[in-house]
Amino acid sequence: IVDQQFEIAQKIADAGLTPIIEPEVDINHVNKLSVEKLLVDKLQKCLKTFNNCILKLTIPDSPGLYDKLDCKKIVALSGGYSLDEACQRLKLQKNMSASFSRALSEGLTHDQTEEEFNSKIASNISKIAEAS
């Protein structure tokens, strides 16, 4: 799957855009750290021939695991973690920024008043910005 994503990313780059490659690791996988290490090995190989991309990755269990990946930017998926846990995990990483669309919307509901909605989303944005 990673090879396929890089093949498509090359086509996107050839069209003048910066591709985002998103090989997500399931946060509930019993061997998450092992899978993440396998993914890093594969990404390092792929990035040797094409690194004009942004990687959107699950926050690793091991701080700094992605530090040596050579690409334009690495952003973190909240990946199913709660907003607070995703932010705590992200703070342990040096070179990752948040891309937390699901966590950003945590606690937002259709029946909130505009004031409640604005207050909650402002709080979420603040937590994510601080973690990044």
What residue spans do the PLM features occupy?
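Extended, alpha-helix-rich binding/interface surfaces that flank or overlap catalytic cores
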Residues: 28
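Glycine-rich anion/phosphate-binding loops
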Residues: 1-7
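Long, contiguous binding/interaction regions
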Residues: 13
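Short beta-strands and strand-loop turn motifs
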Residues: 21-24, 102
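Catalytic beta/alpha-barrel core
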Residues: 1, 18, 22, 31-61, ...
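Catalytic-face loop-and-helix region of soluble metabolic enzyme cores
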Residues: 50-130
